[in-house]
């Protein structure tokens, strides 16, 4: 059979979760871009090679792509993934393939402790953390026939935090 949907959801950040221009290392740059950009790009290339006349490619980014201090490599890698989403969308549109990106805000997947939640929730206009099902429902929509004319878009699922 064939694969109709590719979901690129790999991500890594450096071991401390933050880097600055003064502290960044080549290893952190290489490792972050290898997973967050090169991995998705190579998976997409293989998907395109084996495509028919239909397909959905959905990338996962983050609101950190809007650039936050102390997240240089992570934010830049996800901003690059968003740019690739738009470029690839133009290239493969004639083949009936859509390419979109979902950009979540702070999502409660177990890594947000009570202390961090108290800091971040006030920054979200809708007043609560994003849940994994919020992301999943957006991805399912983009993979569906209802989204057949949506391509090259970055869909922000952030409760209004990233506009």
Q: PLM ranges: what are they?
A:
Residues 124-135, 146:
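A conserved structural motif in NAD(P)-dependent oxidoreductases
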Residues 93, 98, 150-152:
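Short, small/polar-rich loop/turn modules that mediate ligand/substrate recognition or access, typified
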Residues 18, 139-140, 151-163:
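Short C-terminal tail/terminal secondary-structure segment
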Residues 4, 22-41, 58, 81:
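Catalytic Tyr-X3-Lys loop
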Residues 44-45, 86:
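A short, exposed helix-loop element centered on a Lys and neighboring polar residues
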Residues 49, 90-91, 148:
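Alpha-helical segment proximal to the catalytic Tyr-Lys
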Residues 12-30, 70-73, 111-114:
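Conserved mid-core segment of classical short-chain dehydrogenase/reductases
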Residues 12-13, 58-80, 85-94, 106:
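Catalytic loop of short-chain dehydrogenase/reductase
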């Amino acid at each position: 059979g064939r694969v109709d949907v590719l979901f690129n959801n790999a991500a890594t950040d450096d071991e401390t979760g933050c880097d600055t221009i003064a502290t960044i290392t080549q290893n952190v740059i290489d490792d972050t871009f290898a997973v967050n950009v090169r991995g998705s790009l190579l998976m997409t290339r293989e998907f395109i090679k084996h495509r028919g006349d239909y397909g959905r490619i959905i990338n996962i980014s983050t609101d950190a792509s809007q650039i936050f201090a102390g997240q240089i490599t992570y934010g830049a890698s996800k901003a690059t993934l968003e740019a690739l989403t738009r470029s690839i969308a133009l290239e493969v549109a004639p083949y009936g393939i859509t390419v979109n990106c979902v950009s979540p805000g702070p999502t409660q997947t177990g890594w947000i402790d009570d202390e961090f939640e108290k800091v971040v929730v006030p920054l979200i206009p809708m007043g609560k953390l994003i849940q994994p099902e919020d992301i999943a429902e957006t991805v399912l929509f983009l993979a569906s026939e209802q989204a057949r004319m949506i391509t090259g878009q970055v869909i922000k699922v952030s409760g209004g935090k990233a506009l």
